[in-house]
C-alpha cells in the first residue's frame, strides 16, 4: 500500500560517483527502454538499496495492516461480514509474504528485515497507527485506505524491477476486491438506522486526512522522488496521485451519502480537478516518527505475534530437515 519512507530524508544512499562501467551502461539502456531488471542482472547499489527499503516497507505495512481490522474479526456483525474480513486479513498476510520474497531476491534475508521492523529501525505506513473504535472504521479502511493503496500501487505494476512489478499485479487485483467490500459494508450501514449512518460519517471524519497523508509528503518536500522516477520505480508524483484519489473519491462519497470533512473541497473548473484543504504535515511527521495514537501498540503486537509463533517456524525447519535427510537416504 504503502511506501512513505522512500520520501523520508536520509533513507536512500547517495548515487555512486564512479566512472560509468559496461554494466552501468547496460543498466542505463534498460532504464531508457523502460525495460525490466531481474535479480541476476547487475544494478547500481543505490538502486538496490532503494528497492530494499521500498519493498520491505511495503511488506511491513501489509503485515502491520492486518492489525486494525483483525481486531474486529471476533466482533463482526454477521457471519457474512466475518467471513469476508477473515479472507481480507488473510490476503494482507499473503501480500506481505509476496513482498518479503521479492525483497529477498535483492540479496537480503527476511529475518533481517523483520528484525529491523521489530527494533523500530524500519518504517511502515503511518495509516496503520490509527485506531478502529467502531465497525464503520473497518468499512472505511476498505473504501478509503485500500482505495488510496490501489491508486499508489497500480503504477508499481510497471516498476522496472521485475519481481516487484509481478507481485504487484496480484496484490492490486486483491486490493481492488478489498476496496469494493469496504464500500459495500458502508453502503449497507448507510441504509440502516440514524445511529449507523452517524457511525459511518464519524469514521469518515476520522480517516479522511490520514488517508490523504498516505501518498507521502508534497512533491516540494519529497527529496528522493526524482531519482526514483528516473529509475522507473516511482511513476507518478505524490501530489498527482493524491489529486487523482480526491477526484475519484468525491463522486463515491456522493453515492454513499457521506460528507468528506473538508470545507475547502470544491471543483475547480480552470484546473479540471477538485481543490482541497491544507494537510497537517506536522501530524504526519509525528506519526511517522513514532508518536501516533497506536505506534507502540502496533509494534508490540507484532513482536509478540512473532515470538509466539517461533514454535511454528522451528517445527517447519525440523520437518524440512527430516525430509532432506530421508531424500538423501533414498538417494544413497
Label each region the model flagged.
Residues 159-209:
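Glycine- and acidic-residue-rich phosphate-binding/metal-coordinating active-site segment common to enzymes
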Residues 47-58, 77-95, 138, 163-175, ...:
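Alpha-helical scaffold segments that form or flank carboxylate-/histidine-based iron centers
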Residues 3, 7, 198-332:
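Extended, helix-rich structural scaffolds rather than catalytic motifs
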Residues 130-181:
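Internal, conserved structured core segments that host functional sites
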Residues 42-47, 65-87, 149-164:
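Helix-loop segments that flank and shape redox-cofactor active sites
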